C-alpha cells in the first residue's frame, strides 16, 4: 500500500508570477502568455499551474486581448 501512495506524491505548486515579482501581465508579452495555453488554444487552469487567482485573472484577460488582436489564435487549426 505504501508503494502505491509513494507513486502519487505531489510536488508543491508555486506561482511563477509571484516568484518573478511580476506586477502586471501584458498582452504583448507572448512568450509569457504561451506558457499558459495548450496547443489547442485553451487556457490552463490555475489548479494545474499553481498560479494565484489575481495573476490567473490578469493572464486570462491578457490572453483574450491577444486573441482579439490576432496575436494568438483562438484554436489550433482552422479548416
Swiss-Prot record:
Listed name of the protein: Small ribosomal subunit protein bS18
NCBIfam families referenced in this protein's UniProt entry, alphabetically: S18 (TIGR00165)
Domain of life: Bacteria
Key words, A-Z: Ribonucleoprotein, Ribosomal protein, RNA-binding, rRNA-binding
Organism of origin: Blochmanniella pennsylvanica (strain BPEN)
InterPro entries referenced in this protein's UniProt entry, alphabetically: Ribosomal_bS18, Ribosomal_bS18_sf
Cited Gene3D superfamilies: Ribosomal protein S18
Coiled coil: none
Recorded GO MF terms: small ribosomal subunit rRNA binding; structural constituent of ribosome
Entry function: Binds as a heterodimer with protein bS6 to the central domain of the 16S rRNA, where it helps stabilize the platform of the 30S subunit.
Magnesium in keyword set: no
Transmembrane segments: none
KW Glycosyltransferase (keyword) present: no
Quaternary structure annotation from Swiss-Prot or TrEMBL: Part of the 30S ribosomal subunit. Forms a tight heterodimer with protein bS6.
Gene Ontology CC annotations of this record: cytosolic small ribosomal subunit
Similarity remark: Belongs to the bacterial ribosomal protein bS18 family.
Biological process terms in GO annotation: translation
Gene: rpsR
